[in-house]
UniProtKB/Swiss-Prot annotation:
One of its GO terms (cellular component) is plasma membrane. This is Phosphatidylglycerol--prolipoprotein diacylglyceryl transferase. It comes from the Bacteria. One of its GO terms (biological process) is lipoprotein biosynthetic process. One of its GO terms (molecular function) is phosphatidylglycerol-prolipoprotein diacylglyceryl transferase activity. A 1,2-diacyl-sn-glycero-3-phospho-(1'-sn-glycerol) binds at residue 141. Keywords: Cell inner membrane, Cell membrane, Membrane, Transferase, Transmembrane, Transmembrane helix. Catalyzes the transfer of the diacylglyceryl group from phosphatidylglycerol to the sulfhydryl group of the N-terminal cysteine of a prolipoprotein, the first step in the formation of mature lipoproteins. It is a multi-pass membrane protein.
Length: 280
């Protein structure tokens, strides 16, 4: 029966090298995601009063926040013991390892700094960029699949995949589940929802709720990190680290949407050109 499943081919993670520099599939997916997000941001720009300079600054700092926050978050959330024994591991980015939840914290810090610089509200910036985030998430999951990493739990479904280094049994292609839900579906939901003016903070809240829910669901099919495993807890729920980190996002997203709707402060998402508009 095992032979009837798809056996993942051995794919070199490095596409090509020029001297000491190498282009990896995962890095290429980041570039593709950033380019697509930049293009879509230009489309959204036409419906707001942002300037192109402000857009470029925002995306630059947001991208930097993703990279730095993602790496720091991965080390602290998933490899903390290794970091304690080898602090330089934080800088060994060629070994791989990025955390979405860490990247989210990095983006939040970048957006907060940018909103102060642009003299607009933090949630206005968050509402503008939230529909763009799933593009990068989806591209990253494709990179995970090509690298045959972050595979799912063992299964007997007909679309199970035998990944190299994951044993002889077929597994859920959980990377593709996340690509579909956290990338495609979440993008469509946010893009369509944000086409009309919404209460400030509602789009950001919907992103937190949507991603947190999809990630929490997919974690049931994703193999837990070997050095962490599952947290059984008092009720033997067997939840993963990803689910623990996603639960606050779900709660925070619901709370933010309720707050935004109750406040009912309608506005186009974007950076107002005047301080008066920013305070409106």
């Amino acid at each position: 029966m095992v032979s009837s499943y798809f056996t993942f081919p051995q794919i070199d993670p490095i596409i090509f090298s020029i001297g000491p520099l190498s282009l990896r599939w995962y890095g290429l997916m980041y570039l593709v995601g950033f380019a697509a997000a930049f293009w879509l941001a230009g489309v959204r720009l036409s419906r707001t009063n942002w300037t192109k300079e402000q857009l470029s600054d925002l995306l630059f700092w947001g991208f930097l926040g993703v990279i730095l926050g993602g790496r720091i978050g991965y080390v602290l959330f998933y490899q903390f013991e290794l970091f304690l024994s080898d602090p330089l591991y934080l800088f060994k980015i060629w070994t791989g390892g990025m955390s979405f939840h860490g990247g989210l914290l990095g983006v939040i810090a970048a957006l907060w700094w940018f909103s102060r610089k642009a003299k607009c509200t933090f949630l206005q910036v968050g509402d503008f960029i939230a529909p763009l985030v799933p593009i990068g998430l989806g591209a990253g999951r494709i990179g995970n699949f090509i690298n045959a990493e972050l595979w799912g739990r063992t299964t007997d479904v007909s679309w199970g995949v035998i990944f190299p280094g994951a044993g002889p049994l077929p597994r859920h292609p959980s990377q593709l589940y996340e690509f579909a839900l956290e990338g495609v579906v979440l993008f469509l939901i946010l893009w369509l929802y944000s086409r009309k003016p919404r209460p400030i903070g509602a789009v950001s809240g919907l992103f937190l709720l949507g991603y947190g829910s999809f990630r929490f669901f997919v974690e049931f099919f994703r193999e837990p990190d070997q050095h962490i495993g599952l947290y059984e807890g008092a009720f033997s729920l067997g939840i993963s680290q990803g689910q623990i980190l996603s639960a606050p996002m779900i709660i925070g997203g619901i709370a933010l949407m309720v707050w935004a709707v109750r406040r009912n402060k309608m506005a186009e998402t974007g950076v107002p050109k005047s301080s008066k508009a920013a305070k409106a």
